[in-house]
């Protein structure tokens, strides 16, 4: 590591790096996604914002899908290492491992909706991040700590899996033959975790509502410049209601009717 040459860089270090929001600098810098959001003084009345105070943190709101690729030389080449998938903003998202030889992915990874979708893995963890970052006084670091506890368990499980498949490194045919099993296990784990995420999302939303705060992920996922469509007017136009003041120059029917009298 940068501070200790005898310490190896771990997965947890990589996750922490991508979540970093200058917490270790004791207020020297503030993530620039907090401009106009977070006051730096007691009540904000005496704030003097330095020009260099706001910086772009690795855990910025715009850092999305910042995955971690783990190259393991002990695994068969066909496995392609391990991808620790971090969907959504890196600051408050869980990292979940997947081998590179999967034949299919879980259904929650497949929606491509542009706004919040409750059936989407991305939009679910995005919503959790939004609740965390917009209610720091209520949740603090609890959400990030929740993910860290999950990741600790996933790392343990992944080491067991790696050891099992490392035995196939010298036999590419055998490694190829287990791809269906690897895919099956990944789908089952994804389904289990997604159900947990949805439950956690629901619990956090309930906490906000109990605190009297609003939570509308559908509205929050719309573009910042989105404007609600105006209702179509049912009032008649001015042209329709304006009385005519011009005298008609067309002859009346009586004037144009030919005379039959002798």
What are the residue ranges of the model-derived segments?
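Long, intrinsically disordered low-complexity tandem-repeat segments
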Residues: 230-261
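C-terminus-biased signal that marks the final domain/tail of proteins
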Residues: 1-231
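Accessible peptide chain termini
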Residues: 1, 261-262
